[in-house]
Amino acid sequence: MAAVITLIGATASGKTDLACALYQRFPLRLISVDSAQIYRGMDIGTAKPSAAFLKQYPHDLIDCCEPEEHYSAARFCQDAHQAIAKAHADGKIPLLVGGTMLYYHALFSGLSDLPPADAQLRAEIMAEMHTRGLPALYADLLAYDPEQANKIAANDTQRIIRFTELFRQTGQPPSALFAQQKQAAPTWNSLHLALLPERHLLHQAIAQRFQTMMAAGFLEEVARLKMRPKLTAEHSSMRSVGYRQLWRHLDGEIDLETAVELSIIATRQLAKRQITWLNNRLKTVLSMHFYDPYQAETPNRVFQQVAQFCKHNEGTFL
């Protein structure tokens, strides 16, 4: 059975550094699992590795599409399966690294047999949102699918639009579609590594990293993106943390200090959601080994575990 390793963790938990250290020691191929780093032109605010860094440590599934495009979990699964197959064909073990928990869940537990995104219908729904307002679309969702509506925030634009799209495509409530989920039996021998840092240390790292991003030109990056004629604040890419707050600043809604403060708060909230996924939904799908990334002995412990896994799987992926 072919081998796969995952390195999962919240934002700013040190996944990339550890993944690269593993890459130097073992026959691995790095595959990004990040719903923001897939977009071209979104570099600073996503903490995307530099071109020079990627030349030394190549990653699949970075810079896959334009920020105006819709990139779904279904598309990720398709792209990830191709990247994993290529790694195995090259005699490498794929190391999936990133913090988009939905992508991991979809890849290892399967997706509902949902219709693909419909660009024309989505454009119509977004136009309707601008005329009727997001609260009206959420009220509709509450009416035809209260179960799914109560699982999300009333201002969750991305999911409200997607659920509206699914309902209009199929005539069925999204919760009913998700209940029909087809489980895909894992086809890999997998090792799942999870980084779970102390909360206060993670919060410090998030704040420090965001200030570093600002000093590196994050605001200017958002300004360049804002000049793209077809890109709006409602696109999934621009709903990413940091981008939506700085976009609001550039629109004159909030001052820069407030935008930075809100961005750091939103990033901490994202990390909390990621950790909740790790401790709940993903634990029901994956058998994970947890490590504190801020403990000095963690890298060596991870190296030992990966070495044992590689030795056990020697020859099975060639």
From Swiss-Prot:
ATP binds at residues 9-16. Pfam families: IPPT. Its EC number is 2.5.1.75. The record marks 100, 122 as: Interaction with substrate tRNA. It catalyses: adenosine(37) in tRNA + dimethylallyl diphosphate = N(6)-dimethylallyladenosine(37) in tRNA + diphosphate. Its cofactor is Mg(2+). Substrate binds at residues 11-16. It comes from the Bacteria. Disulfide bonds: none annotated. InterPro entries: Dimethylallyltransferase, IPT, P-loop_NTPase. Catalyzes the transfer of a dimethylallyl group onto the adenine at position 37 in tRNAs that read codons beginning with uridine, leading to the formation of N6-(dimethylallyl)adenosine (i(6)A). Belongs to the IPP transferase family. This is tRNA dimethylallyltransferase. It comes from Dichelobacter nodosus (strain VCS1703A).
